[in-house]
Design a protein with these regions (language model features):
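Short, conserved charged micro-motifs
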Residues: 15-20, 71-75
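N-terminal first-folded block
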Residues: 11-18, 24, 32
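Conserved, structured core segments of small domains
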Residues: 21, 53-57
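Active-site-flanking beta-strand signature of metal-NTP-handling nucleotidyl enzymes
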Residues: 2-10, 62-64
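An amphipathic, aromatic/His-enriched active-site/gating alpha helix that lines ligand/cofactor pockets
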Residues: 26-42, 56-60, 64-100
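Short, solvent-exposed aromatic-acidic interface loops
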Residues: 8, 12, 80-81
Length: 100
């Protein structure tokens, strides 16, 4: 059975464009590699407009990723490129993301 997660990432609004560039340059390359190996079924990042948790000065994003199983998800999370991306992205976050 596929394994999926939805993550709500909160980014300071003044860093939203920089976060999107970083995501496009670093995380999308990882997704492309995993998809070409059959280790990622689908994934997306969407900028949220409006919502019950909207906060001034914060831009929310929904990141969805679906893997064939937990082993493939763990392979993504253990990828050194992802760990490097995550260190940079966390600097833009006023609080921890919500993960389901």
């Amino acid at each position: 059975m596929p394994q999926a997660n939805a993550i709500i990432v909160r980014i300071r609004s003044d860093k939203a464009d920089e976060f999107e560039r970083l995501f496009a340059e670093e995380e999308l390359a990882i997704w492309d590699d995993l998809q070409s190996q059959g280790k990622l079924l689908k994934a997306s990042m969407t900028r949220v407009a409006y919502g019950s948790e909207e906060q001034e000065g914060v831009q929310d994003y929904v990141i969805y990723a679906e893997f064939p199983g937990m082993a493939e998800h763990t392979a993504h999370d253990d990828d050194p490129r992802f760990k490097a991306f995550l260190r940079k992205a966390r600097a833009f976050q006023p609080r921890s993301p919500w993960v389901w």
